[in-house]
Design a protein with these regions (language model features):
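Conserved RNA-binding domains used in RNP assembly and mRNA/RNA metabolism
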Residues: 1-94
Length: 94
């Protein structure tokens, strides 16, 4: 598992989460598991604290689960978050 910033193809939405490959997933089935996904919000003003830019991913508000699965073909790219974003995420999720 690794904490990554995920950029989705469809709307360039950025989600930071602990990402793990689902081994043995059938073709077309969700093959990426996200743990504690948070959306990185783009704000008009620079916030004093980057935690203000991270909000729980709205999809997760409909469940008590802390994990969800997505199809990797919905992902445009996976990148390593900047240290200050990673630190804010860790502070919110621990």
């Amino acid at each position: 598992m690794a904490i990554k910033l995920i950029v989705f193809k469809e709307d360039y939405r950025c989600i930071i989460a602990d990402v793990d490959e689902v081994v043995g997933a059938d073709l077309g089935e969700p093959d990426c598991e996200l743990t504690k996904p948070y959306e990185f919000k783009v704000l008009d003003e620079e916030p004093a604290d980057y935690k203000d830019r991270l909000v729980p991913w709205a999809v997760m508000n409909m469940s008590s689960d802390k994990k969800c699965r997505i199809q990797s073909d919905n992902i445009l790219t996976l990148i390593n978050p900047e240290k200050f974003i990673l630190d804010a995420y860790k502070e919110l999720t621990t």
